[in-house]
Amino acid sequence: MTLLNSYFGDFGGMYVPQILMPALYQLEEEFIFSLKSSKFKIELSNLLENYAGRPTPLTLCRNLTKGTKTKIYLKREDLLHGGAHKTNQVLGQALLAKKMKKKEIIAETGAGQHGVAAAFSCALLNLKCRIYMGLKDINRQQQNVFRMKLMGAEVIPVKTGSGTLKDACNEALRDWSENYINAHYMLGTAAGPHPYPTIVKEFQSIIGKETKRQIVREENCLPNAVIACVGGGSNAIGIFSSFISDNSVSLIGVEPGGKGIHTNKHGAPLTHGETGIFFGMKTKIMQTEEGQIKESWSISAGLDFPAVGPEHAWLYSTKRAQYVSITDHEAVNAFRCLSKSEGIIPALESSHALAYALKLMNNHPQKNQILIVNISGRGDKDIETVKNFLKM
């Protein structure tokens, strides 16, 4: 029996081999204990402030919205150490691993941001680190691969399947099932078997807590909408978490529309998927009529995933959050637009969320609205991808 509720409505659960159940129960127990431990909280808070660089600013776009009555604020997770929101939860998980006396960390990565974060948290806390990464993602994220290796991590190429994030996840789980006694699986998003979605949400909720305080201080009111990209969904659930009970605030998750929903070259399981079992959880997934997992597609490696975290599936089913899609082309346009107008280069993942905010602004230019976009990471890693896309 789990100590915490393992489901969000109908979604979630622990669909893993029996051999992994003791490791998941141990993780849940340590997580609950740590949340009650003032020593753990102080240690994590100290790392977030003095190592990671929290709090991150909430930046008002001064040029992007000229000529309209829209205000767009950017939550600047790109300014964290490591360059993305991943830092928040890897520090928490690394501390949990130390408390459980684990010697090794196993992780998966798509865009490489979680891999980089896992690598530096292991370097900081003296843990061995091995990271599984799809061959396709290795080829498009060479800079992050080198960063991981530079910090002492072993990067293991995954050549099976489509050579992307889902295949890296499968290999990481396989490794963990063989080595769970000495190793902790540092899952990179708010997905997978319980208790991972709950743990990752807890450690990412700092984004939403800060954002709410900051926007009330700046505007003396709540925003009209909070917008975030959704792959597995950790940055989105992190910023959504503080606003879920505020029904006046629209929560908008942006999935990768890839080359267009009509082409099947996309990664939008919430709006164009079915309920199924994948990666240890019951959630919305992209699958064929025969139940086989479809290959997802996105210009953004971090969104190239055929499933989504179970809490997003629940928010979608209850209609508390709205989920939309943005194509590769629209995301690249937003990437260029923010870079040129504000001097901020966003990750391609975050550019999906920004693109939808720009749609809302352009559709209602004279509407007084306050939009918050979570800039989940910086775009240095994506320069070559965008350059090749534009053939510059």
Curated annotation (Swiss-Prot):
List of residues that carry N6-(pyridoxal phosphate)lysine: K86
InterPro entries in the record: Trp_synth_b_CS, Trp_synth_beta, Trp_synth_beta/beta-like, TrpB-like_PALP, TrpB-like_PALP_sf
Designated name of the protein: Tryptophan synthase beta chain
Enzyme class of the recorded protein, top EC level: lyase
Lyase recorded as keyword: yes
Key words of the record: Amino-acid biosynthesis, Aromatic amino acid biosynthesis, Lyase, Pyridoxal phosphate, Tryptophan biosynthesis
EC number(s) given by UniProt: 4.2.1.20
Gene3D superfamilies, A to Z: 3.40.50.1100
Annotated family: Belongs to the TrpB family.
Cofactor: pyridoxal 5'-phosphate
Biological source species: Buchnera aphidicola subsp. Melaphis rhois
